[in-house]
Amino acid sequence: MTECWYIPEEVADRREENRLSPNVPGSYEALSEARVFFRHFDPKEVSDDIEGFIQPLLKKLNYHSYDVVNLSPATLGDEKFEALAEQHFMEHTHEDDEVRLILEGQGYFDVRDANDKWIRLLSKPGDCIVLPAGMYHRFTTDHSKCIKTLRIFKEAPRWIALNRGPETEEKPARKEYLARLHAPAETAVGAANSHTIFSLHYPLKLDAELTVITKRLLEQHSKQPLALMIFLTGSTDPTTGASWCPDCIPAKPQVAQRFAELQGKYGEERAIFLQLPVERAGYLGNPEYPYRKHPTLQLASVPTLLVLTPTKDAKEKGDVQWYDRLEVKMRTCDIDKADVLSLE
């Protein structure tokens, strides 16, 4: 996904960019919340070479079958191409995940976000997109009318387009998708409960959201100490079922142990946990990634664990950011050796 942005419900020409005015950019975090996964491969390395590229890719991602789809008037003829183009742009879903890697050309995937708004994804060679089963989406080429994609499957696919409507809403895949979409976020220490366990997905909204949470917690526990543990970890890769960050996988049980120790020290109601998932596509190779430049987080690598406690005058401070009320007592990437019991 080279870029993504929100588009209106109705568009006059599907092959135009159709941005809102003013433009409203999408984000990797909004896509992640909708369970869409994105990964980029070097465009020079992707091809329809079965032995040289496709078979090694299938093995790496633990997929078992594939096909190559070449859409253009030159390959299909004008009439068949336009008929397929109309069909692909109907809002629909599938009973299996849709995994597409762009080999040549470019086009737009439109997907519904968690609030049922359209996000348009500009997809070029090297872009790999995973759309979960049960998610409404549609596709169109741009005005070039030419795209070649590799589709890969875990098993033999049930590749039937289910157009949006009452019958599709009752399909198991759709119900399961909605259940996952609205389920509490899972963290290293349990499901988020908006009480003592939180998961915030949007880096650009972090300060506003955490400032509200921090102020409320300080008011609730005005006479007793509390501690906030922040865990920055790689988000889950649906092609493998695990974090894209290898070091983050063994770190999770270690974080759970450190948090249990924090609960023992401060009490279960006053030990607060916040997990911040880090999206691979937005983070890797990006020195401007918000958590890297954040004055308190100062993310250098994942996983990273921080523990913060209120400043002495935290309760007296007026309208300030969360990081002005809290001070960092511990910051580490070596979570197994972190000593939360010695915090003052």
UniProtKB/Swiss-Prot annotation:
List of residues binding Fe(2+): H92, H94, E98, H137
GO MF term set: acireductone dioxygenase (Ni2+-requiring) activity; acireductone dioxygenase [iron(II)-requiring] activity; iron ion binding; nickel cation binding
Example of a GO cellular component annotation carried by this entry: nucleus
GO biological-process terms attached to the record: L-methionine salvage from methylthioadenosine
Pathway membership: Amino-acid biosynthesis; L-methionine biosynthesis via salvage pathway; L-methionine from S-methyl-5-thio-alpha-D-ribose 1-phosphate: step 5/6
Residues bound to Ni(2+): H92, H94, E98, H137
InterPro entries according to UniProt: ARD, ARD_euk, RmlC-like_jellyroll, RmlC_Cupin_sf, Thioredoxin-like_sf, TXNDC17_dom
Keyword Calcium: no
Catalytic reactions on record: 1,2-dihydroxy-5-(methylsulfanyl)pent-1-en-3-one + O2 = 4-methylsulfanyl-2-oxobutanoate + formate + 2 H(+); 1,2-dihydroxy-5-(methylsulfanyl)pent-1-en-3-one + O2 = 3-(methylsulfanyl)propanoate + CO + formate + 2 H(+)
Highest taxon listed in the record's lineage: Eukaryota
Predominant localisation class: cytoplasm
Cofactor: Fe(2+); Ni(2+)
Cellular compartments annotated: Cytoplasm; Nucleus
Signal peptide extent: none
Cofactor note: Binds either 1 Fe or Ni cation per monomer. Iron-binding promotes an acireductone dioxygenase reaction producing 2-keto-4-methylthiobutyrate, while nickel-binding promotes an acireductone dioxygenase reaction producing 3-(methylsulfanyl)propanoate.
EC number: 1.13.11.54, 1.13.11.53
Keywords: Amino-acid biosynthesis, Cytoplasm, Dioxygenase, Iron, Metal-binding, Methionine biosynthesis, Nickel, Nucleus, Oxidoreductase
EC category name: oxidoreductase
HAMAP family xrefs: Salvage_MtnD_euk (MF_03154)
Summary of the function given for this chain in its UniProt record: Catalyzes 2 different reactions between oxygen and the acireductone 1,2-dihydroxy-3-keto-5-methylthiopentene (DHK-MTPene) depending upon the metal bound in the active site. Fe-containing acireductone dioxygenase (Fe-ARD) produces formate and 2-keto-4-methylthiobutyrate (KMTB), the alpha-ketoacid precursor of methionine in the methionine recycle pathway. Ni-containing acireductone dioxygenase (Ni-ARD) produces methylthiopropionate, carbon monoxide and formate, and does not lie on the methionine recycle pathway.
Family: Belongs to the acireductone dioxygenase (ARD) family.
Protein's name according to its UniProt entry: Acireductone dioxygenase
Organism: Leishmania braziliensis
Organism phylogeny: Eukaryota, Discoba, Euglenozoa, Kinetoplastea, Metakinetoplastina
